[in-house]
């Protein structure tokens, strides 16, 4: 699978692959990428999103395999750092479990793992809801109506990309993404990955997501969980300065910003 990917930065610099969330495609990472010119940044549109829309349907295993193929084909060293947000962080976890040798260090924010006893029932229910035409219209209106409802400020130069993402994600294929994300459980083999990994959540996120970060960190020998003080789920996009400093600190093994704290 050949994903569309934006690329910037020096070819010889450490490579970082950015995996976007579930409502916006890869262009949404631009404010973060602009703050990290010292890295070679690869920003794919995941299957069924943006310019990789025709690579759908979205399935977690297929998405991780496509990212692995991207790293093998575009990164000469054969390894890359991985940064993920929300849906992209789930893909990052899957990649750590299935292709650990491809990942150097990772920063994964807002990762949701289904720990409920009846995973399939959850998938069926949410899939049914997301296939409902009324739900799609409500979602489309919600994403388009008020600037405050958007997951992050949308630059005027990116309005066309934003509207196209909304159009695609509110199509019938939305159910594929919802089902894959809702059914994501701890993948087999995650404990064998020794990639240093930071699982981070906004301190204002739901407690269940913070518990997911703690559980994921427990599965890996070199992982930790932290919280971004005063931040919500979308903080990687709404505060790109803090997020880019967090990523740079983790990737270089230096101190994290003071806003990144131990969970209480």
Residue ranges and their predicted role:
Residues 206-212:
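Conserved alpha/beta-hydrolase "acid-adjacent" motif
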Residues 4-53:
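Conserved HGGG/HGGXW glycine-rich cap/lid loop of the alpha/beta-hydrolase fold
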């Amino acid at each position: 699978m050949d994903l569309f990917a934006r690329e910037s930065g020096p070819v010889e610099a450490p490579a970082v692959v950015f995996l976007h969330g579930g409502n916006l495609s890869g262009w949404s990472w631009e404010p973060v990428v602009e703050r990290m010119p010292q890295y070679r940044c690869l920003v794919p549109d995941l299957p069924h999103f943006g310019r990789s829309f025709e690579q759908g349907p979205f399935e977690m295993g297929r998405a991780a395999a496509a990212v692995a193929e991207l790293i093998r084909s575009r990164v000469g060293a054969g390894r890359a750092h991985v940064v993920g947000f929300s849906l992209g962080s789930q893909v990052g976890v899957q990649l750590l479990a299935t292709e650990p040798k491809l990942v150097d260090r990772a920063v994964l924010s807002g990762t949701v793992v289904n720990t409920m006893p009846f995973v399939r029932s959850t998938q069926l229910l949410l899939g049914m809801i997301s296939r409902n035409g009324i739900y799609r219209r409500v979602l489309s209106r919600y994403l388009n109506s008020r600037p405050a409802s958007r997951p992050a400020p949308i630059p005027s130069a990116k309005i066309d990309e934003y509207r196209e993402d909304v159009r695609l994600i509110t199509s019938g294929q939305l159910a594929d993404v919802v089902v894959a994300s809702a059914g994501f459980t701890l993948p087999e083999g995650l404990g064998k990955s020794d990639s240093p990994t930071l699982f981070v959540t906004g301190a204002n996120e739901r407690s269940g997501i913070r518990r997911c970060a703690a559980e994921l960190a427990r599965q890996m020998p070199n992982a930790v969980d932290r919280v971004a003080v005063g931040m919500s789920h979308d903080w990687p996009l709404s505060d790109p300065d803090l997020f880019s400093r967090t990523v740079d600190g983790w990737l270089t093994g230096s101190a994290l910003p003071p806003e990144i704290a131990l969970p209480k």
